[in-house]
Amino acid sequence: MFKLKFSAVSEGRDNNFDFLRFLFAALVIFSHSYGFLPTLHGTVVDGEDPLGHLSKGQIAFGGFCVDCFFLLSGFLVTKSWISSRSLGDFAKKRALRIFPGLCVVLIFCTFVIGPLCTTELASYFHQKLTYAYLFFMLRGSLHVADHLPGVFIHNPWPVRVNGSLWTIRYELICYALVALFGCLRVYRRPLIVLALGALLLSLNWGRLDFLHSSQALADFLQTFSYFVLGMVMCLYRDHIPYSRALLVVSLASLLVFDLIGELRLVLPVATAYTVFYIAFWKRLPLQRFARPGDFSYGLYLYAFPIQQTLVYFYAPHLSPVTLTLAAFLITLALAVLSWNFVEKPCLRLKRGASWLTGRLRWWPARSAQPEALAETEMSGTPT
């Protein structure tokens, strides 16, 4: 019945991943603007974005877009493992994608945002907390200490300097899972990944009390579920139909289950199908969207501290819309600088760092996978 599969439309680099990542990053800025302004011209509001109101609190743009980021990441990072020559090659690509931009934004927050917005300028550079934040990249994957001395303490969203970075540690855990599965030859038996995805969805559907005893655990299982769904879409793309009829079914199920208040039951699977359908929709003229550069990671890194800074100086004069527009323009400028002077130059080092590739060459990557899957990465820009 469904002859066309995802494998047929996912060949090569003509896809819309770059556009989708940029869109999701922009929507996170939009969503956060409502959280930054819980009072608007003296009137108390609930801080929910329009999608939160439409769904009666079942979903908001911020959380939804973060989940979609992990969904795309699961697909692309699995492809990255499959195309890597070794564990060292894979680790090098992941490290060069994540850490250069992260290190620079931490320096930016510590030495630009901090002194500009602190109430303790005289002692700011003498406090250990200042430099503990600077070295977030060394310990932040295990413990997030997202505050600087006296910075943003009177903001409506107090203390948090860069609240978006909480996803970094979960992203790194997911990368480790992809590598572990590869080293254990799990991708030769993709049913294991499918079973893991089903288990994670069952845990989320079950609303088990222990999952909500820890916000960190709940956040991890949520993002991890979407990442594994992305892995499943990658490994089973030869079997999953690419069908407009199934797209309509997915969209209709989202609408119906939203209306009856049970959106969580269909959201992960329906979202996965819809997002990947759009990602490989050739008729959308978006395949060259990132030709000027891949600015989505820069938007992710810089948006939160820029929004906090704007609120710090101009809160009485801002609305969620004006905050979104101002923050987007400033953050986009920083993202362009980050791409051209930090991320892109560091990504050119992928062919270097032979010491890491050599030390970990005894863990094969591509050779451990079925030959049919050993293709080049499909994203037009690095993931």
Predicted regions and their residues:
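Membrane-interface junctions at the ends of membrane-embedded or membrane-associated helices
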Residues: 82-89, 186-187, 234-246, 280-291, ...
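Membrane-interface helix-loop-helix regions
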Residues: 47-60, 99-172, 272
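Hydrophobic transmembrane alpha-helices
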Residues: 75-82, 174, 178-186, 226-238, ...
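Functionally critical transmembrane alpha-helices in membrane proteins and complexes, commonly lining
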Residues: 15-80, 99-101, 299-304
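Alpha-helical transmembrane segments of multi-pass integral membrane proteins
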Residues: 252-344
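Aromatic-enriched alpha-helical transmembrane segments of multi-pass intramembrane proteins
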Residues: 18, 24-27, 132-268, 311-312, ...
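C-terminal "closing" transmembrane helix and its immediate cytosolic amphipathic cap
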Residues: 1-9, 241, 307-383
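Juxtamembrane transmembrane-helix termini
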Residues: 2-6, 62-96, 101-124, 306, ...
